[in-house]
Amino acid sequence: MKTWIGGAVLLACTTMANAATPQQLQDLDATVERVRAQFDVPGIAVAVVKDGQVVLERGWGVRELGKPAPVEADTLFAIASNTKAFTATSLNLLAEDGKLKMDDKVIDHLPSFRMSDPFVTGQMTIRDLLSHRSGLSLGAGDLLFWPTTSYSNAEVVQRLGQVPLKGGFRERYAYDNILYAVAQQVIEHASGMSYQQFLQTRIFDKVGMAGTRYNADHLKAGDNAAVGHAKYDFKDLRTVAPLTWSNNAGAGGIYSSAHDMARWMQVQLAEGKLADGTALFTAKSQQQMWQMITPQTIPAPSVPELAPARANFAGYGEGWSLSDYRGQKLVWHTGGWPGMVSRLTLVPGEKLGVVVLTNQEVGAAFNAITLSVLDAYLGGEKHDWVDAYAKGVAKGQDKADEAWAKHQAERDKGSRPSLPLAGYAATYRDRWYGDMVVTAEGKGLRLRFAKTAQLSGRLEHWQHDTFIVRWDDRSLNADAFVNFSLDPDGKVREVRMQPISDLTDFSFDFQDLLFTPVK
């Protein structure tokens, strides 16, 4: 696959909106092509804004593997969690309208709102919804909408009240998506509009984001849209179906292009001012969104080559990540979606912005491109970020392989299940997710999540009363251990799950589930 992406086909698949490439970006073409070859990325779009001007917006490669349609500046990609800044902006606009205050209690706007702890329910503010300090664990509750489920937004928010808290309220950073489903409801309640209508009329139309779509459901026939790609079983690159996320669009639903995201960056870097000089939002609102609320622990680099990227401070504001690089404050976010990942980075002190959109799942690709662009403008010692991130990816794969080898070495291969297979067949219920069904089929077992069509697969015996679920959809890369615990009478008491690979996306939060038999 690398040979195809790095070969002659890609030379005919680049487009560029502006005729002259700035001197600082003369090497960008070669960098992007190296990234595509190194990380097997079919298509990439990049836009760069400097001093109020769009200095580059361009596409490389193809929208879909094996098809000739090129990625262009107008090609739509899922921007996933880069949507969070739009949600935060929407709430600040409503604050400017006098419809709410950011420190209002959520329950004052949504009386039915509940967290699993009554104290947190009563104290949670609108600002808390945006800043990842609720006490929820990483990705808690994501299985209510990831992969696509049949739950509505209202059902997701209602079920939030059963998702357990694992930390203290406002105690530490833990990234979540589910509280943005609540933020979506607050916007609708305060504005009297749907979240989609609010985004369209108050942001997209005013900024000039004509091609941007509310979510995958709103892509139109003939839209210039990229197709997502994933490595099935972490190996073979193929296309994947888009996630339908209308039940939590506030966390990550938007599809946009390099062209439209450049307009968004222009507004951000102009303290909320639009092209005509009027204000989308005030400088005060921007200051609030860009102010650190929740500090983050800064991890050590996985390989020495990534050390120059390590921040001196890191935290989260309202819909934005905050850190530093080469003496400059960065305001940024990433987005991850089945088959697509992206990164938007602002350097306010240099009036610089860069967005990288890709139709593959390797974050190393957008990081290598982003840091290469930042280096070109900020100066200092040159660094080979493509090589550095390639080594980081390899290290991550090695660690995952070692963990799997340890599982295999510790496996009791001679053990047998305690029950006949039919003894495990039942409907099981988790308080926040709902039902999981295990059925006996032929000589084996199958497992399916009742509200998630993609989570259906066969159970393969591992040891004792532990199985591995092998999902039918091999693009998920989320196979999991399924452990049945028995009571003294030899009946299943509870079922717990755990992803088998460290590389599985954190949104597959199987470890937060506790299933018990439905009586």
Model-derived regions: residue spans:
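Catalytic loop of the DD-peptidase/beta-lactamase superfamily, centered on the K-T-G motif
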Residues: 20-56, 188-201, 205, 239-519
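Active-site-proximal loop and beta-strand segments within enzyme catalytic domains
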Residues: 39, 62-177, 184-185, 191-193, ...
